[in-house]
Amino acid sequence: MSNYDAEYDLIVVGGGGSGKSAALTAAQSGLKVVILEKRAETGGSSIYAEGTTAFESSEQKARGKPKDGKGHFPTKEEGFRRYTEYSHHRANHEVARMQVENTAETIDILKGLGIVYTDVTIYAYDQPLELYTFHRPDGLGERVQEVLLRACVNAGVDIFTSTPAEKLLTKDGTVCGVLARDEKGNTMSIGGGAVILASGGYGNNFDLVRKYSWQLKNCDTSKLYKCVPTENTGDGLRMALEAGADTANLGALMIIAVARGKTLTSHISGAGSQPILWVNKTARRYASEEVAMSFADTGNTIAKQPDITSYSILDSASVKYFMEEGSIIGLGDFIEYKQKLTRLQAELDQDVADGLAWKGDTIAELAKNVGLDAATFEKTVAEYNAACDKGYDPLFFKPAKFLQAVKKPPFYAIEMTGSVLVSCGGIRVNGNLQVTDADYRPIPGLYAVGMEASGLFGDTYNLDVPGTANGFAHASGRVAARHVIATLKK
């Protein structure tokens, strides 16, 4: 008689992109597979993904070259070097090699499930460092998760939602199952030949963010804003550590700038993310706003400011420009390049009325309404306008094309903050996605994939290779599952 309430060949903890990819691969090989999903629905952070990175894919080969004519489709070797060099070689070279070797297959698998790719491009137009790896699917991440869910069900994967895994079960140093809690609160013991942790990292656990991250270490967690409603609270990390796992680059986060209290698709958030005039609570500029070209770098920059707060300053001319001419930079599919922000004035008016944004007929009045020192703010704006008139920024060397004066009243201030999307470092793994201890010895039966695993990043998410997190989710899940298959068949 079994000592477990249920038994499977493979237990997958988490039903996002990495978990579904692992489960589908294993089930199609004949293994009995279960997904334990904490939330009431599957998808995780992958629902919010836009593009998927891939190297030497069938889509790239069919197109020949990017349609904008500015770059080329990179080789696997170029991708490998960008991962390792961007991270200053903090990336795990085995994991980076796994990524570039397996992402092209993701595109073919998803195409076989009905996904159509509308473009292979970059994330931020006019960003000269980005590689053309961003495979944009019709319907984006939400559509991809729908087809993967259907494929998993058709392959016979059991999926238990509202069922968080709480503890790994081990025997003689080998992981052999999990304890989970079902939707009624009952504890379930589930035995398995292997466990894959695909639970998304710890980015929504603000206590762990404060403890581990270098960007937000010891921050006031009341100032943190969660703009993506996921529950990636470090469950997999905790269970892995209890089982003897090591960590790597644990403190890296993917942070994006967003208007406080708003979504990434709001036009007020889109305007606030543009490379206009930014000041912090000292009423001074704190960076060259061209950093907006990379949302990851923007997130790092804002995270360092007092109270994780920045103010984006607009005048009526810039509001009119964004509404009629469109954005200067894009934020992927949340705010597209040159997208007309037609709702901006209405959103500003509403937020001013609600006390979430501020308006002034003079710079001094705006400063008073925001709570900034008026004399300092007036000096900052005057110096910035002089730089715009000259086409040269003597303070931070901001490119002339982004120098947009703030002269025509009324004036507005949008409060921007950094929102944690996901953690980018975590459980140490090898190239097979096996979880290892501090001596790099694999813990038998235990794997970590997607943003639960470390390996691709240093201290910052690598936007030079757009779509990396999503590409890693699918590739790592598949590679881990194949190692499980090979191990169980020995």
Describe the predicted segments one by one.
Residues 167-169, 362-365, 376-460:
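A glycine-rich dinucleotide-binding beta-alpha-beta segment and adjacent secondary-structure elements
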